[in-house]
Amino acid sequence: MATYEGKVFTEEQEALVVKSWTVMKKKTAELGLKFFLKIFEIAPSAKKLFSFLRDSNVPLEQNTKLKPHAMSVFVMTCESAVQLRKAGKVTVRESNLKKLGATHFKYGVVDEHFEVTKFALLETIKEAVPDMWSDEMKNAWGEAYDRLVAAIKIEMKACSQAA
């Protein structure tokens, strides 16, 4: 079982994550964009963190660079959650994890950004699978997200110490 700060990512949590991801996988482009639109709705200033959005006057929904980025982040986050228990740890490829840490450090991502992103992720999943949604599913996805963020923060800290 995957453990993290004394918590265990259970078989039941894994089943909830896998079941919902199986449904969501069919709509990753749409859900990824919804996910990011929620982030920017909650925290409009987060747009400044993305170079391709800073000077753009194009509506977010039509930004050709946002859509693929949003889908990529959504898929990576969900796949990481699905693999968590099986691997016993966050399974973003090591080189990607280092890159994620470096990128998040470079652009000045802080705890509040991760919290907004978590809220947006959970809301996106809730809307994507309303018939499956429960407190247990919310907790399972929340736990998986928290572990991914913890792994990214470790890499961010390594970057800050190297700077």
Swiss-Prot record:
It catalyses: Fe(III)-heme b-[protein] + nitric oxide + H2O = Fe(II)-heme b-[protein] + nitrite + 2 H(+). The keyword Heme applies. Its EC number is 1.7.2.-. Signal peptide: none annotated. Phytoglobin that reduces nitrite to nitric oxide (NO) under anoxic conditions (e.g. during flooding or in waterlogged soil). May not function as an oxygen storage or transport protein. Has an unusually high affinity for O(2) through an hexacoordinate heme iron because of a very low dissociation constant. This is Anaerobic nitrite reductase HB1. It is found in: Cytoplasm; Nucleus. One of its GO terms (molecular function) is metal ion binding. Residues 8-157 form the Globin domain. Binds 1 heme group per subunit.
